[in-house]
Amino acid sequence: MKKVAIVGLGWLGMPLAARGWQVTGSKTTLDGVEAARMSGIESYPLRLEPELVCEADDLDALLDVDALVITLPARRSGPGEDFYLQAMQELVDSALAYRIPRIIFTSSTSVYGDAQGVVKENTPRNPVTASGRTLKELEDWLHNLPGTSVDILRLAGLVGPGRHPGRFFAGKTAPDGQHGVNLVHLEDVVGAITLLLQAPKGGHIYNICAPAHPARNVFYPQMTRLLGMAPPHFRDAPDNGKGKIIDGSRICNELGFEYQYPDPLVMPME
């Protein structure tokens, strides 16, 4: 069995550990470390400030693994773009020093910016947000690393326990009601990471997004009704099409992955 380190034992990391992998993980606080250990996960305190802050013995235990999974998102607020980029580079450099042969990094489809139509992995990346630009730069850096094999997963909007999409636009006025949604369930992200951990080699770049893309003006009102919340109102420009549609089929075609929840309208949210 492979031993895997997960940096970012949050709502993505904890379910991955529950899949039965031999896992070490990190949390930023001692309380978080204790909670993870109570759940049966070997966990150690680690902070990125952006330099890596971790006791030497803890770092030895954390990174004595066959693969590293990084699920720390680039924040839209808080410390700037350079902070996140430097922190991730510090972390990966440490992994390389420990000769970890496989790295999986969860990026975001925000790297595509305002692209229209069907978006595949080879679609030019033109991010329009600070976090998207940071992720693009980090992707390029990871892709060119020598001596290791990096998989990059570009995740669509994440939904699942604790992230009910009915709360995203409840009671708000929003544009582009005819545009399709680009969402993926937590369990499918965990499934994709698990599949990559089992693959004989890395170096992949995949979009992870449910195959169905119901219109925003259909999907979000239905989700708010499930929560008993006020539905959103959408402003529609004439003939503005379906917007950006993320194609997440490449991992299916190449590795035989199957989305457990292909349709956002019937995804379990709690």
Which residues fall in each region the model found?
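C-terminal amphipathic/interface module of NAD(P)-dependent oxidoreductases
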Residues: 42, 46-50, 239-270
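Conserved Rossmann-fold cofactor-binding substructure of NAD(P)-dependent oxidoreductases
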Residues: 39, 44-65
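Mid/C-terminal beta-alpha module of Rossmann-like enzyme folds, strongest
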Residues: 190-195, 199-248
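Conserved Rossmann-fold NAD(P)-dependent oxidoreductase catalytic core, especially the SDR/UDP-sugar
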Residues: 90-128
